[in-house]
Amino acid sequence: MNNKVFSKTRANPSLAYCYIEECINEPDNKMYRYYHWDSKHKMYSERTLIMDEARLVNYLMYQKPDYLMQLLNECRLYSYVLRKVRAYNKAVDSQTSELCKDDQEMQLALRLGDMDKYAALERSNRHKAEEMLRDSFYAA
């Protein structure tokens, strides 16, 4: 099932200036394609949104469709998504480093040179940070 959300048209009434297409490539694994009309080349430019970008667009599509339409109509969706994902990743990195700094088990693994255990604990702390900050990711 592919859903498409179109922006209001600009000069040509039969042509949407921006639109987003939902693509399901595996069960529970969505990706989105964002199309933006390039008037210089007279064709659409396409961006594929996956992972965090797709998660944010999915949230907007099903929880805040009016805001999604506003972003599409203003042709700001792609820049909005990139800005939110960058801010989220920066916050997750910062929170992960704070968690790692206070983790005694990680410090011990580092002193003993057990890099496999250190990497596993770091991934675990990153996952904790992502879970802690997920709600702020969706706040508009």
Residues covered by each model-derived region:
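Extracellular/luminal domains of secretory-pathway glycoproteins
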Residues: N2, A16, I20, N25, ...
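Extended, Lys/Arg-enriched charged tracts that mediate electrostatic binding to polyanionic substrates
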Residues: N3-V5, T9-S14
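N-terminal leader/targeting segments
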Residues: S14-L15, V57
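Short N-terminal mixed-charge amphipathic segments
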Residues: E22-L77
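Short runs of predominantly hydrophobic/aromatic residues within well-ordered alpha helices
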Residues: E53-L56, V81, V85, E122-R126, ...
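Aromatic-anchored, charged helix-turn/loop surface patch used as a conserved interaction hotspot
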Residues: L60-Y62, D66-D114
